[in-house]
């Protein structure tokens, strides 16, 4: 159990650092649209779909490696709490249309790339 926590923690650190570094990219949101967060969440959803499909196809994958990748790296990398804060900010600033677009794109693209990641393995 303790070793599993170490794997999750190391993966979370790696994912969080990657997330932080991507957030430093000098890209300015167009009309306040949080494109970097959207891209990070879509990439994380794709990675989770791909890893899950690989785990299903290759049963010999190390369970601790899966904890490291799924819960740790992907959990630290994706940003649903940031997504929620940014969506609330868009709503509070009267940008309801952008908030709805951001929410729809996040959900639709997220589910789509999970399926794509799974399909690539099959």
Which residues does each PLM region occupy?
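Membrane-interface helix-loop junctions in multi-pass transporters/channels
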Residues: 1-122
